[in-house]
Amino acid sequence: MTRNTGTRNTWARNTWTLSADHVDLRRPVRKPRPVEIGALPQRLTLDLARTALVAVDLQNDFCHPDGWLASIGVDVSGAAAPIAALASALPGLRAAGVPVVWLNWGNRPDRADLPPGVRHVYDPDGASTGIGDPLPGGSRVLELGSWSAGLVDELVPEPGDLHVAKHRMSGFPGTVLDAVLRNLRVDTLLFAGVNTDQCVYATLVDAANLGYDVVLVEDLCGTTSPGFCTDATLYNVRQCFGFTTTSADLRAGLDTQEP
């Protein structure tokens, strides 16, 4: 009798095949699934078999009118802007076999792993409502397992989706994100989420520096920052790190894939 080491794993892509007296170290071979999409600065051909979507920080504290940002007077409409487009794009990506990774802030209740520089961003004067502090509704800002750190209701994870908690602007330092992506055997990352110019960008840059191909999906990202911040981010992504596309271009490519 043989058994694959990934039989309990929805995304069993980095596995061995085992029997009582033999171990086959060959990984499963997936047929390439190329699709061509419009992008900048050049058109792209993606291999869907080696692509994942990373959706960043689409959480109540950033996007919901009862969340942390709104409670301190920030207009969250910019952060909420990509939610409907992402909800519309997800079924096609999942049907194409693209893994969805939800990458969200999720801090320890004791904040023991947060250096002063990170805490200062969210509480610059030491007297404001910052990470881990209670909100009027009782939830604590970006605390793992809280309503505040939860995904917005409009985005419904499916059982095969993956979840990674982060505690920096980038999703890589001190997290399992790189290990998860390596085990998925993916090379190309599509980026969605908020804020375009902050956590999405920081994670994208780290991903590029780790050797991943990075593609920012413009209308699946949003921000509460001034417009010039998005302009600068898109320029830098195209100039220094990777590519940008839109959900319409992505959908057009998915529609042409072979069954």
Please provide the spans of the model-predicted regions.
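N-terminal nucleotide-binding beta1-loop-alpha1 segment
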Residues: 56-57
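Short catalytic/ligand-binding loop motif for oxyanion handling, primarily in non-cytosolic enzymes
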Residues: 108-112
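Short, glycine/acidic-enriched capping/hinge loops at junctions between secondary-structure elements
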Residues: 64-69, 113
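Active-site-adjacent betaalpha module
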Residues: 1-52, 61, 92-96, 113, ...
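A short alpha/beta connector and helix-capping loop motif
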Residues: 49, 67-93, 98-104
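Short, well-ordered beta-to-alpha junction loops that form the rim of enzyme active sites
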Residues: 103-106, 194
